Amino acid sequence: MKKVILLAAALFVVVASFAQNEYNYQKRSLFEQLPIRGNDIVFLGNSITDGCEWAELFNNRHIKNRGISGDRSGWLLDRLDPIVGGHPKKLFLMIGVNDLAAGVSPEEVAANIGKLLDRFAEESPWTKIYVQSILPVNGVDTKAKAKNHWKKGAEIIEANKLIEALCEGRKNVLYIDVYSALVDQKGMLDQRYTNDGLHLMGEGYLAWKEVIEKYVK
């Protein structure tokens, strides 16, 4: 019986991974057909970015959502061409939590973000880049689906410190601490804002909006 359970679990992981990759490819293919222009504001990241209707939230038709569920900092580097080539006015980046959940170090996450910043500095230097902190996670709910994520609270804090330091002194780059606006007194993602310990509910996106609204305008 134990072997059957282990086999079923392994098959589930394989199927989930395949489905995730298929979704990633589908979204990338779509984004490659949708041009970015010089007056656009791009939101770039993983499922937490992907899950919001940013243009509607800010009532701004120039906002383009380029979040892809499951994305990681290294994978994100492979899909920058249409974004950098479009020379957007602004870029809001949030990435890294999936890396940490997969065992990637905070140092490597920061290094990949550094590569992104270097590329924009070289190819689209007038784009204003807002690097947002990785959000907190919450594992209080034992039914939380993102168990590999909510064990990474300490790594998230460390990664945010490295990312903030990375942004210092760079032209047209600003680090934004969104983490502090969504964390509770116990150092976890406020339960008002999530239903699975990782992703955001509507109130969570509104709290995020309050932090960055002055930069989006």
Cite the ranges covered by each PLM segment:
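Cell-envelope and extracellular/periplasmic
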Residues: G67-I68, I95-L100, G114, I134
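Generic structural signal for well-ordered alpha-helices
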Residues: L80, I113-D118, N160
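A short helix->loop->beta-strand "cap" motif at the edges of active sites that frequently abuts
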Residues: S124-K128
